[in-house]
Regions:
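Hydrophobic alpha-helical segments
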Residues: 10-12, 16-152
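Aromatic (phenylalanine/tyrosine) cluster motif
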Residues: 6-8
């Protein structure tokens, strides 16, 4: 490996693991344009809070992504459906753990706790996530054919 490649890889590793290194700046409400402020206002109204998460402030650097993402999250996480709000948060936490998204794990764990998740529920959820990931890897590794009665 050439020295230049080594330094590039080390830089990528440091950037990927350093929580203080942001890819873009955060857009505060007072610095936002009208399009971004409209989304922030909807987030505040929907969530019944004045707080805007850093996630939204970061993706506000591209207003179409902010708008599209908020509309999707709003519909899926707060719209009508058969799943209660805590179950939705538990699913979000499980997917975030599997994807390794520390930001999403933290924010949705906080949201889950505000909806009634306690340490026992969180522990049970982590056991399910760990078991599902382990058995998924086994099924993939062994290339197990799907049983006829399980096929969709």
């Amino acid at each position: 490996m050439r020295v230049s490649h080594f330094f590039f890889l080390v830089t990528l590793e440091i950037t990927a693991t350093n929580p203080c290194t942001a890819m873009s700046h955060l857009i505060e409400y007072e610095d936002a344009n009208d399009e971004v402020r409209a989304v922030y206002d909807d987030i505040r109204a929907t969530r019944k809070t004045e707080y805007i998460n850093n996630f939204w402030k970061a993706i506000a650097n591209h207003p179409p992504t902010l708008q599209r993402t908020w509309q999707n999250v709003k519909e899926v996480m707060t719209g009508p459906g058969e799943l209660d709000p805590l179950t939705r948060e538990l699913i979000y936490i499980a997917v975030s753990v599997t994807n390794g998204c520390q930001y999403c794990i933290s924010s949705h764990t906080a949201a889950g706790r505000s909806k009634g998740m306690d340490d026992a529920i969180f522990g049970e959820l982590m056991a399910i996530v760990a078991t599902a990931n382990a058995t998924n890897r086994l099924a993939n590794g062994y290339q197990i054919p799907v049983d006829e009665q399980f096929k969709l």
